[in-house]
């Protein structure tokens, strides 16, 4: 393959699409930094989150007191969101009807306007769904950065699952994929996790 000779551009013609759900808006902010990709994300503007779901970090899950405080906060956020959406919808509906718009049409428009502003109180833990398409070269870069032990836990777990899906499909492309320490020295220097041997045992070389 040309990629064996140091030419990576040919693998840009191979693309992979992933359906991703049950991840937080925190992860969304990180994954969209990878610019050579296409994203379709569940809208909080047009979809009212009556069924408020959220991601609980493992470190919070592991400490009962922290978990209780986190769950209470999520319940409060959910109620504030729904209360605010309701107040905004009622206010917008009254204004639009006062301007002569029929009630059914006014309420439909008011609902969208309410969702647009009510979402500002939603936490980063709020779940979202997305479809992501990346070419193979971008995926190699993504795996190098996000499979690293120093990557944030949620996006690292996602990267590992994505790698597990694409490797069986195209092992000739992804045989050297993974964190940078798979194919060379760790680039983190003093910040190295010190678990290179463990990483190498988990990632196919």
PLM region spans:
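Family-specific signature for flavin-dependent thymidylate synthase
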Residues: 1-202
